[in-house]
Amino acid sequence: MKFTIIGKALVVSAAAASLAVGMTACGNDNTSGTASSSGSASAECGGKNALTAEGSTAQQNAIAEFNKAWGQACAGKNLSYNGTGSGAGRQQFIAKQVDFAGSDSALAKEQIEKAAERCGGNPAWNLPLVFGPVAMAYHLEGVSKLVVNADVLAKIFQGEIKKWNDPAIAALNAGTALPDTDIKPVYRSDSSGTTDNFQKYLAAAAPESWKKGAGSEFQGGAGEGAQKSAGVVQAVQATPGAIGYVEKSPAAAAGLPFAQIDNGSGAVELTDDNAKKAIAAAKFAKDGNDLALDLKSLYSTKEQGAYPLVLATYEIVCSKGYDADTAAAVKSFLKVAANQGQANLSKAGYIPLPDAFKARLLQSVDAIA
């Protein structure tokens, strides 16, 4: 089945930021409490008041919106989220130091058994809650519209295409006067889920050109490294001829232009609606309530008008194995996040969940015991 999935994968702040999640009420004997009148949907407010989570910084701002909504829908509820990175979040979840993890990637094969042990012998589930488009931000004087594709990007970030007027780029930009300027690729020098997803995109959409693999460390071997998203934005701003991959929100805030991406069916601008089209074409890796995505189906889509470079982030939870108070609170938070918590996501640079995907996500949330 295809589901439209979009939300922005961003970093979550700690307890200081009230993180709220809009969720639809879902009848469950283990979740008690009164529904709040605030928000667009009633909320189940059972379970303990304080939850802890850790992980992805890409979803952090979205988590802050969710926590704010949770506190409004369920008085006294609060999630303390520590944005230490996806790897640290998964480790802390497995070690039972937090109630759930935020992660830019689903659990790795070698982590699945350990996560099940943490969950009392029950599987941990990867629930994609936050989606954010990744922009190809650039700095090229006199060029207000630029089109690239996965093949061109793969060759740029490996140092094979070195000039902006290279014939491969010119072929995608008919009618545009491209300068004879050196291309300056900018990549994340720190371990990054954005890097991992960017390289997965290149591997899926340009397998003949990108053979460097994926992973949270940049493998291309060309360009200038910069720390975190803010560093990429600053480097692109300061460097004529630069191009870098970075989450849409910080790039837009800096006023940087974004390249359009030709997915094989024409050039596509980065908009919420165009990103949703790509997510609608994506598939889950397997059946059941573990909703890990088949990223190849997302990144290699040729759906007309679909912007394919989208970062998905997960909440990694126990399917069973929580005590009753924790299970009820986790479900409450996730339901609010999927409902009331969606209201301000677009302003924060994320893509609100489409109804069809939200309904599927809530089925899995409902099944947490």
Predicted feature locations:
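Extracellular/periplasmic juxtamembrane helices and adjacent flexible linkers that interface
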Residues: 2-4, 11, 25, 43-46, ...
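Sec-dependent N-terminal signal peptides
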Residues: 7-17
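Bacterial Sec-type N-terminal signal peptides, specifically the leucine/valine-rich hydrophobic h-region
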Residues: 20-23
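Bacterial signal peptide processing site
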Residues: 27-30
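N-terminal segment of the mature folded domain
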Residues: 33-170, 233-235, 249-254
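Sec-exported extracytoplasmic/periplasmic mature domains
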Residues: 64-76, 94-98, 106, 138-141, ...
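Ligand-binding pocket segment of bilobal, Venus flytrap-like solute-binding proteins
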Residues: 90, 191-284
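Extracytoplasmic ligand-binding site segments that recognize negatively charged/polar headgroups
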Residues: 133-137, 143-233
